[in-house]
């Protein structure tokens, strides 16, 4: 390698130093000689030196095999000296169309045998190793199908079971809880299938609203017992520590409204029901009807009527003595039995002994529809089924012979008079307002408020009072008129006069800057 590098450097130096002499100083007329056309020596190309990494890799590689010597072409004499057997034989192709010629003796076969080439470097295949002969096993004898089945073992008979003692009943009756245990203190809810006890009844027409008032805040509405449409439930609200339920009549029929209340002192549920009869729609009736008031009695004698049909808005419980009849007479009235003379005399004597109640104490009167026309008690009682009766009458108090005694005989005559007085007061006040007579209108309304403080047409009375105070004259008072309209807006949200009262109240607030 170093020799080649030295030669390359020497050639480069020679080519650089071979410069012809300057000819500018030679003055000669002869043309300059031609440049030397002799070929210059070829400069060998520089071979890059291998890096140490390449040398290390080249040292690990195996040596390259030696190149095969070049074959020298044979001369014509050498070809002639070769034996004929070494010359290649040419096999003529045989066409399928031409017939096959028979072979001659001593002719060369069509297919030459391929001589076996034995290489001294290839070892002959080793013979297989001898295997040990397997021992001979005798074949098992043939098995018959009967012998293939497994033999069943003989099971000895089990001894008869010994008589076991009778076991006790798995389900035993649970012991009743003690009175002081927590389980005994938990109240049981009333069964759903139990028929509620009807304590009151009310009648209203289609389109009217029904208000049911219960004392206390724990009352809830359970549902309609007959499960028929026609009476729609609206809401429950608290009004001065009382529960007020609102319904509306949409279809005719007889309904039973069930209510429930939990008494914390007794630890039991109190159930109550209200019988409602919806009649066809009528004109000129009040929009809201108040159901009779609920009064619960702890204990009552057999001849006491727990609940009576009372007018809308003032229903009470009364005993047989208040109406001047005994329990036997009331039972006879409901069952149609005759009343003996001695029973009537006894009732009259009891009435004279206790005294006749004053008119202001008589709160029981006949049911009315919207406070307009009195409804006979037999019409209301007819709408209530016999199974909803509040109490069964003992057989001892039932006479034997039937009779037709009307129920209206036990209703005080003052009930009809009171209903007439209510209509007269409001009719007079309306007439006086139409005539512009505010003094007489306010006087009639004052008598109405004093005598009937819980009438179902109280909203109409308050509206007439506001109208009377707006009449021009000595009685004009805008502040009192505004208070009357506000009373309707706050206490009677379902009143038919609510919209008119709201309009008048807005008018007074907008057009009167200072109300004195």
UniProtKB/Swiss-Prot annotation:
Compositional bias of kind Pro residues: 122-144
Keywords from the named record: Signal
Species in which this protein is naturally found: Treponema pallidum (strain Nichols)
Ranges annotated as biased composition (Basic and acidic residues): 71-85, 351-367, 415-426
Signal peptide: 1-17
Protein name: Uncharacterized protein TP_0369
Disordered, as annotated region: 29-197, 296-426
Pfam families attached to this UniProt entry: YfiO
Lineage: Bacteria, Pseudomonadati, Spirochaetota, Spirochaetia, Spirochaetales
């Amino acid at each position: 390698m170093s020799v080649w590098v030295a030669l390359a450097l020497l050639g480069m130096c020679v080519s650089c130093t071979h410069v012809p002499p300057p000819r500018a100083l030679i003055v000669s007329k002869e043309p300059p000689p031609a440049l030397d056309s002799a070929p210059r020596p070829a400069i060998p190309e520089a071979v890059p030196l291998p890096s140490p990494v390449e040398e290390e890799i080249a040292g690990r590689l195996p040596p390259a095999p030696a190149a095969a010597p070049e074959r020298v072409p044979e001369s014509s004499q050498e070809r002639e000296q070769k034996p004929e057997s070494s010359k290649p034989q040419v096999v003529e192709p045989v066409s399928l169309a031409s017939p096959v010629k028979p072979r001659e003796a001593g002719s060369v076969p069509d297919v030459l045998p391929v001589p076996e080439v034995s290489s001294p470097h290839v070892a002959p295949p080793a013979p297989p190793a001898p295997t040990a002969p397997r021992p001979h096993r005798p074949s098992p004898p043939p098995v018959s199908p009967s012998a293939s089945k497994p033999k069943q073992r003989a099971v000895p008979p089990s001894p008869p079971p010994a008589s076991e003692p009778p076991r006790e009943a798995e389900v035993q009756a649970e012991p009743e809880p003690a009175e002081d245990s927590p389980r005994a203190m938990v109240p049981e809810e009333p069964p759903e299938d139990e028929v509620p006890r009807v304590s009151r009844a009310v009648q209203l027409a289609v389109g009217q609203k029904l208000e049911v008032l219960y004392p206390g805040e724990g009352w809830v509405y359970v549902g309609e017992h007959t499960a028929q449409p026609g009476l729609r439930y609206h809401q429950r609200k608290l009004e001065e520590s009382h529960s007020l339920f609102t319904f509306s009549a949409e279809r005719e029929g007889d309904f039973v409204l069930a209510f429930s209340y939990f008494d914390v002192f007794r630890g039991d549920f109190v159930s109550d029901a209200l019988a409602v009869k919806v009649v066809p729609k009528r004109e000129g009736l009040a929009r809201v009807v108040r159901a009779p008031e609920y009064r619960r009695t702890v204990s009552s004698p057999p001849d006491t009527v727990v609940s009576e049909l009372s007018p809308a808005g003032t229903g009470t419980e009364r005993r047989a003595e208040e109406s001047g009849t005994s329990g036997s007479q009331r039972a006879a009235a409901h069952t149609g039995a005759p009343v003996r003379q001695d029973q009537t005399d006894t009732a009259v004597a009891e009435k004279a002994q206790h005294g006749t109640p004053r008119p202001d104490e008589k709160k029981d009167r006949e049911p009315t529809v919207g406070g307009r026309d009195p409804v006979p008690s037999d019409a209301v009682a007819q709408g209530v089924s016999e199974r909803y009766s509040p109490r069964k009458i003992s057989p001892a108090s039932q006479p034997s012979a039937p009779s037709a005694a009307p129920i209206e005989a036990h209703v005080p005559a003052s009930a009809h008079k009171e209903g007439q007085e209510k209509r007269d007061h409001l009719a007079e006040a309306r007439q006086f307002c139409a005539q512009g007579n505010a003094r007489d209108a306010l006087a009639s309304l004052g008598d109405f408020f004093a005598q009937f403080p819980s009438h179902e047409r109280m909203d109409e009375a308050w509206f007439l009072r506001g109208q009377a105070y707006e009449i021009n004259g000595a009685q004009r008072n805008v502040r009192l008129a505004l208070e009357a309209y506000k009373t309707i807006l706050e206490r009677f949200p379902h009143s038919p006069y609510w919209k008119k009262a709201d309009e008048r109240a807005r008018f007074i607030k907008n057009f009167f800057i200072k109300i004195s």
